[in-house]
């Protein structure tokens, strides 16, 4: 993701903070909101990855505690010429994964226990290669910042609703604006997720296939994860829906309404593109020796 795109998204988030601040306390509230937004943007840049990992109760693992997963990630980073990220595991039966971090030097990848149980070593390698492609493309900064700030906007809107806001009778926007903001803020959070270009997922699919050298590994994994995500809930994702776009497959897919605001391309389309890669650009055999067999 480009620096320009990051700047535009942060500016949009700041604008929403200012609007809510004005509704809460007029011009004084807007100034306070501006200061808070500036501090929050800086805090999110340095700490949003930690916050997202904490939201999902992720625990860091190493070569001793998760040798298979750690070994796969290490081998893939060597293939891709990337620094070794921190590796995390999330205790949930839904198979899924995501990457986070402001740059490749400060990146983290997370896999669920359900993912490690459901996939073959080859499929797991395909998924982790996809996440490392996000790291390589610097998608993780934008994805993590928007997840953190979208959640913050919703919380601030709830604060405005429950604690009154600007009751100045000379301000006709007060009561009406408060109601509008209460309704629009959650929608804005979902729209931010959709603003992350779906082309980033396609690009990470291709990048992951190039890193591991086997597009069909990821194609098979996506099909398995898609089926499981519709039948197994992800409690931490349900509690933090603004982070849904971080995952390789929408963790909220078990609910029909979530499909109206889907943050991911069609899994069928992604699989079709990967199969085309397998018979086209990446059809030549690649070395397969590694922790996956």
Curated annotation (Swiss-Prot):
PANTHER family: PROTEASE HTPX. NCBIfam families: PRK01345.1, PRK03001.1. It is found in: Cell inner membrane. Zn(2+) binds at residues 130, 134, 201. Keywords: Cell inner membrane, Cell membrane, Hydrolase, Membrane, Metal-binding, Metalloprotease, Protease, Transmembrane, Transmembrane helix, Zinc. This is Protease HtpX homolog. Its EC number is 3.4.24.-.
